[in-house]
A protein has these predicted regions:
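Conserved beta-strand positions in repeat-built beta-propeller and related beta-rich domains
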Residues: 31, 40-42, 47-53, 87-93, ...
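A short beta-strand motif characteristic of beta-propeller blades
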Residues: 23-30, 64-70, 104-111, 148-159, ...
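Beta-rich, blade/repeat-based domains predominating
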Residues: 31-44, 72-83, 112-126, 157-174, ...
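Short loop/turn segments that connect beta-strands within beta-propeller blades
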Residues: 60-64, 99-103, 143-147, 191-196, ...
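Beta-propeller domains
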Residues: 51-62
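A short loop-to-beta-strand structural motif that recurs across blades of beta-propeller domains
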Residues: 55-57, 94-97, 138-141, 187-189, ...
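Blade-level signature of beta-propeller repeat domains, shared across WD40, Kelch, NHL, RCC1
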Residues: 212-257
Length: 257
């Protein structure tokens, strides 16, 4: 289990030039498995996967399929975990909440009027949502009522993050992790909460067309889904630096790790 990272200072600033690579170590790759959006669920100790169909799949942290069901949404483009289940999005502005067995919790809705091309989605510890879109390239924080709390344009980063596809956050370091696909750098961007670029790690040697990213925080296990490459790669990951004073709420430890 990773040690607590509290008591360290908050890093501030904006994107800086020449970021290095994070400490990322490839463990294994699951081939012939399409993953366009992935999210770690501490409550069930597993990884939820969307493959741009009507289904979502639950995997163990070791990559074994545990569950699969129809969501009732024609196409699931992105997903994230909430207390009562999953928030799913079709990539065209429609969102829906379902429980962990696939039953609808509420009717389809719009999370925010500004969202039309949602590629990646992550519910943060404070209840707000980190969202990435690629047309235009932007990273946003959206309040539960739809208010835009932060909007950063990826083409202004150094190096540019032009095709952000998946997003998650490490509750220990506070860092935001974003993958962009082969129309961009096919890399993992590690960002401070304000968008400062901490590291950029190329992923092309592990797979083609990175689109999903998830993190099991207590072990530092990182999952990257490759769409065009039809693969799920598993890594050990260590943050470049700590950008928050106190670790965020992350849910229960996984009993099977």
């Amino acid at each position: 289990m990773r040690k607590s990272l509290g008591g360290l200072g908050l890093a501030v600033g904006m994107a800086v030039g020449n970021p290095g690579s994070a400490d990322i170590y490839h463990r294994e790759t699951i081939s012939d498995f399409r993953a366009v959006s992935i999210a770690y669920d501490a409550l069930v100790c597993g990884i939820w996967v969307a493959n741009e169909s009507n289904e979502v799949v639950l995997l163990s942290t070791f990559g074994k399929e545990l569950r699969r069901f129809d969501t009732g949404m024609r196409t699931v483009r992105s997903l994230t975990v909430e207390e009562d289940g999953l928030l799913i999005a079709n990539g065209w502005g429609e969102f829906r909440r379902i429980d962990r067995d696939g039953r609808a919790i509420d009717a389809p809705f719009r999370l925010s009027e500004t969202l039309y091309d949602t590629e990646g989605l992550h519910r943060d510890a404070d209840g707000s949502f980190l969202v990435v879109e690629d047309d235009p390239s932007r990273l946003m924080r959206i309040a539960p009522d739809g208010t835009v709390l932060m909007e950063l344009f990826g083409d202004r980063f150094d190096p540019p993050m032009t095709e952000p596809q998946g997003i998650t956050r490490d509750p220990y370091s506070g860092n935001i992790l974003v993958v962009d696909d082969n129309e961009g750098l096919n890399s993992l961007f590690e960002l401070a909460p304000d968008g400062r670029v901490l590291s950029v790690s190329p992923l092309s040697q592990y797979g083609f067309d990175a689109e999903g990213v998830a993190l099991q925080p207590e072990t530092g296990t990182l999952y990257v889904g490759f769409d065009g490459g039809q693969a799920l790669a598993i890594f050990d990951w260590i943050p470049t630096e700590i950008t928050i004073d106190t670790p965020l709420e992350r849910g229960p430890d996984c009993a099977y790790s």
